Amino acid sequence: TLARVMAGLLPASQGQVLLDGDELQPALQKRKRSELQKIQFVFQMADTALNPRQRIDHILGRPLGFYLGLKGKEKRRRILELLEMVELPQDFAGRYPEELSGGQKQRVNLARALAAAPEVLLCDEVISALDSIVGANVIELLKRLRKQTGVSFVFISHDLSTVASFADEIV
């Protein structure tokens, strides 16, 4: 519920959402593009979060165009950088989601969120659908990305040991 309120998907029953001291509009539809860019969601089920009819380069390119205004070669370069950031080969840009494993899809889901250059990533049970080895690898990737990008994470999980291994603070 907290993540959905932060993202503007649900209204808060009371209070307000502040980011860097500025109040965010409660409803997603009323947020400005700059507000939308600041908070990105990484959903639990990458299968349903990725459009099966679009190639990975299109999925990653859409937020690059929408939020950052990138086009052409600059957009292509950034798509390849994003794939590298989430430790996927560059040739994945030409693939469709159905050609990827669950862990690879979740990495694409993460890359799509990072494409917006957000301040906060809302990670809702991002490893619960993955086996333990793949999930552990994704957690290590998230730790590296946090150091590399400086993005803050709201990490939601029912597995407290996973949360403890990742979090600076647990609420």
What are these regions (language model features)?
Residues 24-40, 58, 66:
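ABC ATPase NBD coupling module
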Residues 7:
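Helix-to-loop junction immediately C-terminal to a conserved catalytic motif
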Residues 96-100, 104:
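Conserved ABC ATPase signature
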Residues 117:
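Conserved catalytic motifs of ABC-family nucleotide-binding domains
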Residues 45, 54-66:
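Q-loop/switch helix immediately C-terminal to the Walker
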Residues 163-165:
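A short, surface-exposed alpha-helical micro-motif characterized by mixed small hydrophobic
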Residues 73-91:
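Conserved ABC ATPase "signature" region
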